[in-house]
Amino acid sequence: MATVTAALVKELRERTAAGMMDCKKALVEADGDIELAIDNMRKSGAAKAAKKSGNIAAEGTIIIKEVDGIAAILEVNCQTDFVAKDASFLAFANEVADAALAGRVEVAELQAAFEEKRIALVTKIGENISIRRVEFIEGAQIGSYRHGDRIGVVVVVVASDADQETIKQVAMHVAASKPEFVTPEDVPADVVAKEKQIQIDIAIQSGKPAEIAEKMVVGRMKKFTGEVSLTGQAFIMDPAQTVGQMLKAKGATVTNFIRFEVGEGIEKAKEMSFAEEVAAVQKG
């Protein structure tokens, strides 16, 4: 049996970023053959990653990258907020975002290109990691804002007088107020029709005649389309005016925006209470 030296363990650690004991064990099992040890560790890592893939990854980070009028916004997920702050995890997410922007690479291609590195990271960290989504936005004036690592916004503004601070404030507003559309006119007809019927039913159930209910709903629908659209919302920096009014005063128009929030739309596993955990342990 070959001698496993400290130098071999050190080299394997540098090449794989695995723990010292894992490296020593792999070298012993490979009889000191470092290349075989690496192959075995990769196979073992893939198996571990496959087992972890069923775990819900609803924490993570939002990364924004921008160059030459194009911005990429990316979500990479993990299982806990502790790992979401891990340097290795964040380095991985930034590397993926750089690659996405450089080649305008869609998510399926990114997932394939980074699968080997993802598996290595899962093995190192011990949590499921997933490249969830990426979107791109173009424009001469792009503003962005990240609220911590959990919320990211990019906006495209066509402006004559709006400075970068104003554009950033619009991005901050999107982060805080969660508009779904740019203007009230952008709200799809099916969304408007569905909400209108709900409001009519509410009015009728309150005892109003159908013709009166129809008239009441007109005002409610104007309020609804304003609340779900960026330009119709009260500007968080100055609630006395809407975002649309502020932009008009600046000679500016928002043409598009994207808002990502970590874990939105992912159904998280129900957390067990202490009593439930004890009961589960007793059941074996």
Curated annotation (Swiss-Prot):
Residues 80-83 are annotated as: Involved in Mg(2+) ion dislocation from EF-Tu. It is found in: Cytoplasm. Pfam families: EF_TS. PROSITE patterns: EF_TS_2. The keyword Protein biosynthesis applies. CDD domains: UBA_EF-Ts (cd14275). Keywords: Cytoplasm, Elongation factor, Protein biosynthesis. GO terms for molecular function: translation elongation factor activity. Belongs to the EF-Ts family. Associates with the EF-Tu.GDP complex and induces the exchange of GDP to GTP. It remains bound to the aminoacyl-tRNA.EF-Tu.GTP complex up to the GTP hydrolysis stage on the ribosome. PANTHER family: ELONGATION FACTOR TS, ELONGATION FACTOR TS, MITOCHONDRIAL. This is Elongation factor Ts. The gene is tsf.
